[in-house]
Amino acid sequence: MGELAANTLTEGKFIGYSAGSNPAGKINNAALKIAEEILYPKARLASESIELYSNNNFFFDFAITVCDQARETCPVFHNSLNTLHWAYEDPALIIDYEIRKQKLFSIYHDIGSKLNLLFKQEM
């Protein structure tokens, strides 16, 4: 949801990438549906490992983790000027599809709001 929010709700102020510490190997079906609804190219989405972005080939102004600290260890970024953590419970654990989709959509909008506030603070 972070990638979607950064790339669709911030008017180009941020470019979002997404990766997980334990990628599932596939995109959550509710997340795919949201991408479709907001007209985000599903081909740009992938279930990638954080290792892809944690080498010296990538450098970020902000690395924002959104993992559920109660259930998993959040990654540490050394190739970022700023590291932030916004904790969200993992919606993939929600069994009911409609409830999971609603939760993902809520997270999507919440991250977008936080990114826009962050941009205002940095300016």
Residue ranges and their predicted role:
Residues 1-123:
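Short polar/charged helix/loop
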